[in-house]
Amino acid sequence: MKKLFYTLAIILSCFYSAQTLADGVVVDKVYHPYVLPNEKEVEWRLLSHQKGNTNSLAQRFAYGQSIFDNVMVEFYIVGERDVDDNFSLSAYEVETRWMLTEQGEYWADWGMLFEFEKIHNKDIWEVTSGLLFEKEVGRTSLSINAFLIYEWGNDIENEMEMEFRAQYRYRWI
């Protein structure tokens, strides 16, 4: 009964809406807490969204691989289109995903994410740490990410942010 209560509380919190102040960040990925032994990954993500009369475009290229059975490291190069419609390098990132529990070991699967980012040609730095959660029930799964982000540098006001992401999936087959 206790597990059902916590699961329902998490699901209902995904639908709760409150006034928030956001800095224009668009969620482009919900992370899962799983790492496979000998996993290698090449990733390309394209992100486009409307900003007033223009559209913002960013691309992320990454290579990653597991360094232990439960730890994966990825290296990202980020490119963005600027105000003059020129596409150029904008940031570098190193991301580490750590699987804390084996899949199915506990009532939910848990992991951590750590990320370090540097904006190209600016004194802007960002460090992120987050908790990754996934619960599978039958054909459905719920993934929740909770991140704490700290930005600092001479070209940005130092700030701490919190970010939440969620994904609910139903597997048809």
Positions of PLM-derived features:
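N-terminal signal peptide c-region/cleavage motif recognized by signal peptidases
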Residues: S17-A18
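Transmembrane beta-barrel domains of Gram-negative outer membranes and organellar outer membranes
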Residues: L21-I173
